[in-house]
Structures are given as C-alpha cells and as structure tokens.
Curated annotation (Swiss-Prot):
Its cofactor is Mg(2+). The keyword Ribonucleoprotein does not apply. It comes from the Bacteria. NCBIfam families: ilvC (TIGR00465), PRK05225.1 (NF003557). GO terms for molecular function: ketol-acid reductoisomerase activity; magnesium ion binding. This is Ketol-acid reductoisomerase (NADP(+)). Involved in the biosynthesis of branched-chain amino acids (BCAA). Catalyzes an alkyl-migration followed by a ketol-acid reduction of (S)-2-acetolactate (S2AL) to yield (R)-2,3-dihydroxy-isovalerate. In the isomerase reaction, S2AL is rearranged via a Mg-dependent methyl migration to produce 3-hydroxy-3-methyl-2-ketobutyrate (HMKB). In the reductase reaction, this 2-ketoacid undergoes a metal-dependent reduction by NADPH to yield (R)-2,3-dihydroxy-isovalerate. Pathway: Amino-acid biosynthesis; L-isoleucine biosynthesis; L-isoleucine from 2-oxobutanoate: step 2/4; Amino-acid biosynthesis; L-valine biosynthesis; L-valine from pyruvate: step 2/4. The keyword Magnesium applies. The lineage of its organism: Bacteria, Pseudomonadati, Pseudomonadota, Gammaproteobacteria, Vibrionales. NADP(+) binds at C45, G46, A47, Q48, R68, R76, S78, D108, K109, Q110, G158. It catalyses: (2R)-2,3-dihydroxy-3-methylbutanoate + NADP(+) = (2S)-2-acetolactate + NADPH + H(+); (2R,3R)-2,3-dihydroxy-3-methylpentanoate + NADP(+) = (S)-2-ethyl-2-hydroxy-3-oxobutanoate + NADPH + H(+). Keywords: Amino-acid biosynthesis, Branched-chain amino acid biosynthesis, Magnesium, Metal-binding, NADP, Oxidoreductase, Repeat. It comes from Vibrio atlanticus (strain LGP32). Mg(2+) 2 binds at D217, E389, E393.
Length: 494
C-alpha cells in the first residue's frame, strides 16, 4: 500500500490540507435521523468505542459491537465493556454482514488487519467509519469502491465524549468524507448523523478532510500536546532537585501545574494564561518563551516536515513490524526518569502558586502552542485545524499527567501519539538540558520571584501584551471559543 497523501499532486495536497470549516448548527437540524433504523456495528470497545457507542444508543441509534472470537471467548476487557453495558456483542462473521455502518475504533496499529478482515464481510454499499484517518492517509488502505468512507473525530479522550454528552453538551468534532469513497453521495449525511449521535454537533463540528485531520493530529500530539509536556517535566524536575527544592514539592508542582496552567488556556487562550502572572513574571515568561521558540523552532519544523513527507509514518510502521522494540524501550526509559518516581507529598499548593512558581512552565506552554500552530499553518493546514490540534487539546492531555504522571498520558493517548511523543521528547530533552536550562534558576521554576517589586517598564509591558494578543492563534481561538460558548448556551438552554 502506498501513502495516499503522497499519491496526490501538489494542488490536491494543498486543497486537502486546507479543509476545515466551522459548521452552522442549522446544518444538523435532523440530528441523527439519517442513521435511525440502520444497523451500526462498532469494531473495538476501548475508551472511544464504548463511549461513542453509549452516546449513539442514547441518541436512539441501533448499536452493537463486533469483536474477535478470542476476545469474546476469553471475556477480555473489550467484551466486558460492551456486555456489561447491555450491548449485543458478536463475532465479525455474525454482525458485520448485516451492518449499514461499520465503525472501526480499534488502535491505529490494528487498522490494516481489522479492515482487511471486515471488508470482505461488509454488504454492498455499506459505509465504513474511522475516528482517525491514519490507515487511509498514511498506510494508503485500498478500500472497496462501493463503500462510503467517513470520519468522525472527537477532539478529546473517549471518557470526555461521554461526560459532556451526559451534561447535555458534547465535544468539538472533526468530520470528513474520503473523496475516493462516496459512491452514492451520502457521505456527509452519514458523517453528520454519526457526529450528532455522539453529541458533537452541540459543541461544534468542523468540516475537514482525512488528510487535514491526520497531518494536524500527528503534529499536535508529537510536539506541544505530549512531547513538550514530557520534556518540560523531565528537565524542570531535574533543575529544581539540583537547586535544592524538596522532591515532593517539585514533582507536585509539575504534575498538577500543567493542568492548572493550561486550564486558563481553555477560558481565554494564551492571553488569559499570561494574565494570571504578575507583570514582572509575565515579562519574564514572555522573554523565556521567545528564547524557547528560537531554540526549538527547527525541531518543530522537522517534525512537521517528516509528517508531511510520510517519513514519520514509515519509521513508526517499521517499528510496528519489529514488535515495537523502540516504542517499548522508550516507554521503559520514561518510567525510570526521576520525575516519574518522585516521592508522594501532602504539601498543599494553591492555584495561584502554580502560576507564581511555574513561570517557566507558562513560558513552555506559550512557546509550544505558538510553534506548533506556526509550523502547521506554514505547511498549508488552516488556522481552525491548527488551533484544535494545539491549544484546544492541551488541557485535556495535561489532565492525564495530573492523574498518574507521564505514564498515564502515554497510556491514554494512541500508540501513534506515544511513538511520536518519544521521538520529539528524546531530542527536546537533551536540547533543553544542554542549551537552555543552565541559564535559568528557581526564580522561574520552583520558588518564584518572591519579594521582587511589581514595577515594570510601561513601554515593555505594552510591547509584551501586544505580542501575546496579536498572535494568530489568539484571533482564531477567540472566534472558535465564542462559537462553542454560543452553542453550549443553546444546547443547555441557558
């Protein structure tokens, strides 16, 4: 199979990369009706599989789960997830032939094998759904011409898909139709109904493409979403311990600080996050973030280049074929880092203290968000896609670190994201350790500026504020957050 993106000419590549349109709520007036009375079979029952299925069932759709016979016989977790929630569970051979829509929600690594197994069982004219387009775009999966192929990609972990639905809302969602596979012209009807069934239409759906979703998703998760959190945690912990800060405090500041700091992003972008700092701390964080951007821009651009060219995917798939030897080795190395093993502490840290003593963390977040956004948009990905795959998802990933440190982050994210995270962090960590961290002290990570006067130069502060607020990620972020707020008010009646 050939990389699908690389078979396109330049004009087609740019067209597919640039697909992203925020859809009006009026486009979903029929909600999930198009799929009512049709049989939906989900393959795989992990976090996304189970929670999307629960939402669709609650939306009045007919949902069942097809699992490998061995998973059923051995009553594996996927079987328990579906069975204990009252779903019909059957083998591929039993359920796939009657399905109108087969949704593949297995891990990326399994997609080729799963699709090659289920495709011969699918009836003529059925539809095949994905929540991540890696198999189509990077592996170049050859799909039957009679199949309609669509994507619905919620921009958050599966557990949040369910929780937001239960609140009467949903999560922002990218939807797409594979241009090579829409023989009956019903792809968008199917995708919109599926998205509505999960509740995504209440938070806002973006009309995207398989290509735009894959390339932006890979870039975001490798760099700011996962790689930067991992590298930043490791080097910041090392700095604090070397300078005499108590290990329990240092670890807790990082583990819970990323979540607290990025929560500010969710409400008001980089501008609001920076506004949580005192004026001297804001100026310091800005200066540090500018240094970080200069230092790390080549690394961000390299990752974007390798994603666009397909080099990243081919490298990772070679590791798949080698029994994940690199992935498993990097996972073990991460588990042995000092940050992952810091002693538990009952020290209390107030919300504001995370900002005051985590100035460097704020700087890393600003630098990482802007670098990822800039690398994506410079490659033809439009602002909306770049925003969702950088700033928007960061608080969700930071929440996983808060739960069980880097281990939890790497367990929750996809196998593809985990591999890319290690590729980035394995270069970023020594780069920061050697070229950046020697010049910083615990006034920006661990202890704060203390009794420093709040006095700043007015002209300098104005310059800093304008630079922060005038970055393109802030403009598109304000627009998209206002859309989501408007939709939430409509959805919950308030």
């Amino acid at each position: 199979m050939a990389n699908y993106f690389n078979t396109l000419n330049l004009r087609e590549q740019l067209d597919q990369l640039g697909r992203c349109r925020f859809m009006d709520r009026e486009e979903f007036t029929t909600e999930a009706e198009y799929l009512e009375g049709k049989k939906i079979v989900i393959v795989g029952c992990g976090a996304q599989g189970l929670n999307q299925g629960l939402n669709m069932r609650d939306s009045g759709l007919d949902v069942s789960y097809a699992l490998r016979q061995a998973a059923i016989d051995e009553k594996r977790q996927s079987f328990k997830n579906a069975d204990e929630n009252g779903f019909v569970v059957g083998s591929y051979e039993t359920l796939i032939p009657q399905a109108d829509l087969v949704i593949n929600l297995t891990p990326d690594k399994q997609h080729t094998n799963v699709v090659e197994t289920v495709m011969p069982l699918m009836k003529e004219g059925a539809a095949l759904g994905y929540s991540h387009g890696f198999n189509v775009v990077e592996e170049g999966m050859q799909l039957r011409a009679d199949l309609t192929v669509v994507m619905v990609a919620p921009k958050c972990p599966g557990s949040e898909v369910r929780e937001e639905y239960k609140r009467g809302f949903g999560v922002p969602t990218l939807i797409a139709v594979h241009p090579e596979n829409d023989p009956k012209g019903e792809g968008w009807d199917i995708a919109k109904a599926w998205a509505a069934g999960t509740g995504g239409h209440r938070a806002g759906c973006l009309e995207s493409s398989f290509v735009a979703e894959v390339k932006s998703d890979l870039m975001g998760e490798q760099t700011i979403l996962c790689g930067m959190l991992q590298a930043g945690s490791i080097v910041s912990y090392e700095k604090m311990i070397a300078d005499g800060i108590e290990p329990g405090y240092a670890g807790k500041l990082l583990q819970y600080g990323w979540e607290t700091i990025t929560e500010a992003l969710k409400f008001g972008g980089v501008t609001h996050m920076m506004d949580r700092l005192s004026n001297p701390a804001k100026v310091k964080a800005f200066e540090l973030s500018e240094e970080l951007k200069d230092l790390m821009r080549p690394l961000y651009n390299k990752h974007m280049d390798d994603i666009i060219s397909g080099h990243f995917s081919s490298t990772m798939m070679a590791d798949w074929a080698n029994d994940d030897v690199n992935l498993l080795g990097w996972r073990e190395e991460t588990g042995e880092t000092a940050f992952e093993n810091y002693p538990a502490s009952d020290v209390e840290i107030s919300e504001q203290e995370y900002f005051d003593n985590g100035i460097l963390m704020v700087a890393m977040v600003r630098a990482g968000v802007e670098l990822a956004f800039e690398a994506m948009t410079a490659s033809g990905i439009i602002d909306e896609s770049a925003y969702y795959e950088s700033l928007h998802e960061l608080p969700l990933i930071a929440n996983t670190v808060a739960r069980k440190r880097l281990y939890e982050m790497n367990v929750v994210i996809s196998d593809t994201a985990e591999y890319g995270n290690y590729l980035f962090a394995n270069v970023a960590t020594p780069l920061l350790r050697e070229k950046f961290m020697p010049s910083v002290a615990t006034d920006v990570i661990g202890r704060g500026l203390g009794g420093t006067s709040n006095q700043v130069d007015n002209a300098k502060l104005i310059e800093v504020n304008e630079a922060i607020r005038n970055h393109p990620v802030e403009y598109i972020g304000e627009e998209l957050r206002s859309y989501m707020s408007d939709m939430k008010r409509i959805a919950v009646g308030g």
